[in-house]
């Protein structure tokens, strides 16, 4: 018995439908595999580029800085951040740092105000299943007011807690996927007056083979002012 459907027999229609479904499933499977590979590779590349960009940004801030704050602390979202050196543990690293950068006007003259810039780690805004305990590097920026060329602001008088809680402070996430203990700030103040800050960053990638799971880079920043 023949069953015609627009010129096709029932058998031919079933065969055509099977071939169509097979081709469709194959295309979808290939697309999903390629998408997964592409996502993993791009994520890895972007994280490294993001980290390099963040470290260069930090280095630029420290080069322009006139003051590196030491022995300070502040509270952000219920967590206390200690800026080294800790009075209780001299020489120990911290997980935050802040500097004061003089504001220069369009004529290249100091305005008397400062940009207070700092960095710290906090939990990820969007947790990643591959790195559930990962942290993100945050940069905060605040501009002082009221300073003049004749009567400039004293950067050492700035209260970092006030800076953190001010509505005028901008917070920017510069790097994601940093291990909880993967970033350390160490501030040195030798007799010759050169202040330096050493940063160590380490990240584990759960989506790479064990031998490649750890990305570690050291960065040494110096301020000669």
Language model features with spans:
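Short acidic, glycine-rich loop/turn motifs
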Residues: 101-106, 201-207
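N-terminal secretory signal peptides that target proteins for export/translocation
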Residues: 1-3
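Type IV pilin-like appendage domain
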Residues: 86-188
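Aliphatic-rich helix starts adjacent to a transmembrane/signal segment
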Residues: 5-64
């Amino acid at each position: 018995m023949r069953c015609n459907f627009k010129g096709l027999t029932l058998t031919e229609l079933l065969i055509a439908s099977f071939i169509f479904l097979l081709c469709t499933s194959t295309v979808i499977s290939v697309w999903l595999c390629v998408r997964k590979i592409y996502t993993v590779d791009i994520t890895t590349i972007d994280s490294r580029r993001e980290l390099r960009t963040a470290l260069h940004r930090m280095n630029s801030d420290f080069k322009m800085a006139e003051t590196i704050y030491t022995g300070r602390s502040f509270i952000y979202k219920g967590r206390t951040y200690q800026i080294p050196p800790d009075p209780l543990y001299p020489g120990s690293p911290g997980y935050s740092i802040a500097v004061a950068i003089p504001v220069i006007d369009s004529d290249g003259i100091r305005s008397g105000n400062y940009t207070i810039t700092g960095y710290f780690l906090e939990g990820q805004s969007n947790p990643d299943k591959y790195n559930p305990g990962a942290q993100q590097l945050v940069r905060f920026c605040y501009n002082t007011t009221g300073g003049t060329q004749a009567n400039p602001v004293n950067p050492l008088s700035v209260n970092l807690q006030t800076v953190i809680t001010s509505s005028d402070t901008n917070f920017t996430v510069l790097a994601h996927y940093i291990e909880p203990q993967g970033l350390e700030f160490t501030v040195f103040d030798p007799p010759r007056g050169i202040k330096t800050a050493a940063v160590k960053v380490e990240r584990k990638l759960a989506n790479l083979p064990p031998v490649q799971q750890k990305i570690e880079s050291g960065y040494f920043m110096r301020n000669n002012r």
